[in-house]
Amino acid sequence: MEFPYRAEGRKAPDRAPKLIASVIKEAERYAGDLGCEPDELAFGGRSMGGRICSMAIAEGLPAAAVVLLSYPLHPPGKPERLRIEHFPALAVPSLFVNGDRDPFGTPAELAEHIPAIAGPVEVHWLEGQRHDPKPDVDDEIIEVVGRFLSGL
């Protein structure tokens, strides 16, 4: 999905509550289009998109799982500004796929905060990758996400 602020051509994102509402609305619409319930689907996204999906699920969006690509644990250089307040309410299986050189969260930082997540968690590190993984790891990402979803 495309967030409304992007569709409107704005660079600055809306506040989290509006983004979460957009995800919930689109998830429900998509499930309806498929003739199923949202809890039969996995949701996710890259960076802020994944974070907002995880927040929507933590706030009650039914889901089978969440896939988080390049999760922004904190702003670069600001590890004290963690984006994990919703982790204890995240009770679905979660997959994190991050670069091991991502300035938005190191492997050690993510490992420290993952135990706060209520549901089962898998983590896959993309060796030598930063926040924007290079296309040469696309097949690796597809394989990891596919294996995770197949195991649900």
Model regions and ranges:
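Acidic catalytic loop of the alpha/beta-hydrolase fold
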Residues: D100-G105, H131-D132
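Catalytic histidine-centered segment of alpha/beta-hydrolase-like enzymes
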Residues: Q129-I142
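Catalytic histidine neighborhood in serine/cysteine hydrolases
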Residues: A116-D132
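Short beta-strand/loop motif that positions the catalytic acidic residue
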Residues: L90-A91, F96-N98, D102
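Short beta-strand immediately N-terminal to the catalytic nucleophile in serine-hydrolase-like folds
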Residues: E40-G45, L69
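Serine-hydrolase catalytic machinery in alpha/beta-hydrolase-like enzymes
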Residues: M1-E40
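A conserved short beta-strand
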Residues: P62-H74
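Gly/Ala-rich beta-loop-alpha elbow adjacent to hydrolase catalytic centers
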Residues: G45-C53
